Structure formats: structure tokens, C-alpha cells
């Protein structure tokens, strides 16, 4: 089922357009509030399912916050993973190569692998595994060396459809600032 590509990309592009037309930070906050209210609840409940489910009981089961909202977030993470320039090139390549065609997530990601030179096969696990990972961050400041060490630990919940969740790649952007 490739609905997650069509709808995830549509939601992502709508969010980006809205951010360009308004205040980008305010729009992002609104998008995240909606994601946390709708999709996180779905991912943490009995109806948790992958963004690209292998099967479904009813066609209505496909039109969910996971397919739309989480699908958009996966594209946003892809942009972070490959960088803005490679993302733009990958998107241009995707439209040039596949406009008007029925395509798969694999076709979509192949364009970004080609544009960025990165292997994104591990990243595709996001489409097959339900649940919302939790990141726990701890930091340690070494006064003597002036070094900040940030340690991130990911935990993935079991869901009704996945009793053995695996770690998922998560692109992270971080910055540190001095007091002055």
C-alpha cells in the first residue's frame, strides 16, 4: 500500500507551503501539536500500525493520522538526513522520473539515494514498524576540556502488531551555546 507516499508527501508540501506563507516556527509548532495529539495517540494505542501497512481489515483503516501525519514527518526526517540541497535535487529527480506514474516508497527513496549518495535502506524501516520511539538525552560538561558530551538513548515500545521493535535511524540537529 503506497498511500503513505502520496498523502505523506502532500501533507509535507502543504506544511512547507504554510510555513513559507506564515511564520515558519509558529507553523511548525502547530504541526507538531497536531501530530502529538492525533498521531502519537494512535501510535501508542491498540490501533498502532506501520506507516505502510502490509495488510488492512478495511479500506477505512488506511486513512489514519499515521499514514498522513507520520508519513509527512518521515519525509521531513529524510530532508534532515540528506540535507536541503540533496533533498531538493532528489525531489526534482523524483518528479522528472516518475510524474504521472504509480510509484513505490522504494522508487521515491532511490531518487534521494542517487541525489545524496547515501544508502537510505535502514531509514525505510520507519515505514514498516509501528510505534513512536522515545529518545532520552543526558549531557555531561567537562569543564577542563570545554567539551559537552550528549548521549541519546532510543527506546521503542512494543505495539499490538510488533512485539520485537528495532532501533530506528533518527537524524538529529543539535546546537550548543555559551552563556556569553
Model-derived regions: residue spans:
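Beta-strand-rich binding/interaction modules
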Residues: 119-121, 130-180
